[in-house]
UniProtKB/Swiss-Prot annotation:
Note: The class A beta-lactamase family has a specific amino-acid numbering system, sometimes called Ambler or ABL numbering and often misspelt as Amber. A multiple sequence alignment was used to derive a consensus sequence and then the consensus was numbered taking into account insertions and deletions. This allows use of identical numbers, e.g. for active site residues, despite differences in protein length. UniProt always uses natural numbering of residues, hence there appear to be differences in numbering between this entry and some papers.
PROSITE patterns from the UniProt entry: BETA_LACTAMASE_A (PS00146)
Protein name (Swiss-Prot/TrEMBL): Beta-lactamase
Organism: Bacillus thuringiensis
Keyword Signal: yes
């Protein structure tokens, strides 16, 4: 009997030991991520997703696309999310955040520095910089061209001023972003191959970064105003988030597009007499040559607006 009892005790001891190891391993695996998530929270976040999940799913079926959404009402901390932690190619949305990094790392006077570039530096879709090869442009004008006109050469110059794609990634890491991967310059970063994590992020992470730059403490007030004014003047987003909000709402946004039907828009939106709303909507399709749908972004925005009223 004593032997059986000892065997039984041994089995119990082994089970407890394995359970202890499992819990320890789980903590080791998730602890870092949980700590990062905790650092991102600035207040109690209230989620409102039950009513919107079905609507976003229906939009995916309607447009034959995958959609990632994250929105936060900065006045109430209510959030809307859908596939908010899934990766999407960020495409040209990075230009607004890279402009924020540029402002973070440089004085406002630096924006008056004249940057010269050659015809060989030009890449596809550079409607502003291609007109100034002979004269160069002020750094502030280049940042504005990247944000407002989505000028790709301007985007590359922004990258160069902050240490390249990896310099951009490093700056975001310092802000608590352990998600965004930035690897390539324009225009290769728009390749957007499904499953390729290069030049990708999530709707939640992008919205969190945009919030930090536009209403948070990542920039002082004077620099925040410069960035948001650039975004308010965006010339490429009229059919996107702007099309999904009431006409009396003010929108500052940055769009993006790429292969595989990639269409994105990120924005800070000011409803009348309310705190701003931060919105990130990312989308993609399965086929490389698939056309993107601006209307998908507009209708996803309508779902967000209705849910946050």
């Amino acid at each position: 009997m004593m032997i059986l009892k000892n065997k039984r005790m041994l089995k119990i001891g082994i089970c407890v030991g394995i359970l202890g190891l499992s819990i320890t391993s789980l903590e080791a695996f998730t602890g870092g991520a949980l700590q990062v998530e905790a650092k991102q929270k600035t207040g109690q976040v209230k989620h409102k997703n039950q009513a919107t999940h079905k609507e976003f799913s229906q939009l995916e079926k309607k447009f034959d696309a995958r959609v990632g959404v994250y929105a936060i009402d900065t006045g109430t901390n209510q959030t809307i999310s859908y596939r908010s932690n899934e990766r999407f190619a960020f495409a040209s949305t990075y230009k607004a955040l890279a402009a924020g990094v540029l402002l973070q790392q440089n004085s406002i006077d630096t924006l008056n520095e004249v940057i010269t570039f050659t015809k060989e530096d030009l890449v596809d879709y550079s409607p502003v910089t291609e007109k100034h090869v002979d004269t160069g442009m002020k750094l502030g004008e280049i940042a504005e061209a990247a944000v407002r006109s989505s000028d790709n050469t301007a985007g590359n110059i922004l990258f160069n001023k902050i240490g390249g794609p990896k310099g951009y990634e490093k700056a975001l890491r310092k802000m608590g972003d352990r998600v965004t991967m930035s690897d390539r310059f324009e225009t290769e970063l728009n390749e957007a191959i499904p499953g390729d994590i290069r030049d990708t992020s999530t709707a939640k992470r992008i919205a969190t970064n945009l919030k930090a730059f536009t209403v948070g403490n990542a920039l002082p007030a004077e620099k925040r105003k410069i960035l948001t004014e650039w975004m308010k003047g965006n010339a490429t987003g009229d059919k996107l988030i702007r099309a999904g909000v009431p006409t009396d709402w003010v929108v500052g946004d940055k769009s993006g597009a790429g292969s595989y039907g990639t269409r994105n828009d990120i924005a800070i939106v000011w409803p009348p007499n309310r705190a701003p709303i931060i919105i990130a909507i990312l989308s993609s399709k399965d086929e490389k040559e698939a056309s993107y749908d601006n209307q998908l972004i507009a209708e996803a925005t309508e779902v967000i607006v209705k849910a946050l009223k």
